[in-house]
């Protein structure tokens, strides 16, 4: 306030409670999402949810106003070389531009719900996570009101 003319009466009302980092590490997954998946409404047999075409980063801004959407494949949460592990949230497998879409909190929630259901069904059935019954996962998603197609 002292050093900026015109700001003598300014007061701080609020500030971010935590530092956010937008771009972090991602897994090398059984399937890595691509820019094409995001831009061309990628469709997958193992879809666990949908997310609108929304890219915000790396000099690209596409706002989710078109009605276009991509499906999030279950395989993008299965890391290569590690058995019985799911990785949800902004660390799911994908290239740089797909990450600008999938790192958003709402998309992370979509992946998290799918991961939680898959994990529960894996434990219940005794199946490994890479062998979980996708029809059962999708049926439970539908029962919970999730749009995955």
Task: Tell what function each PLM region has.
Residues 1-149:
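Flavin (FAD/FMN)-binding glycine-rich loop and adjacent Rossmann-like elements that form
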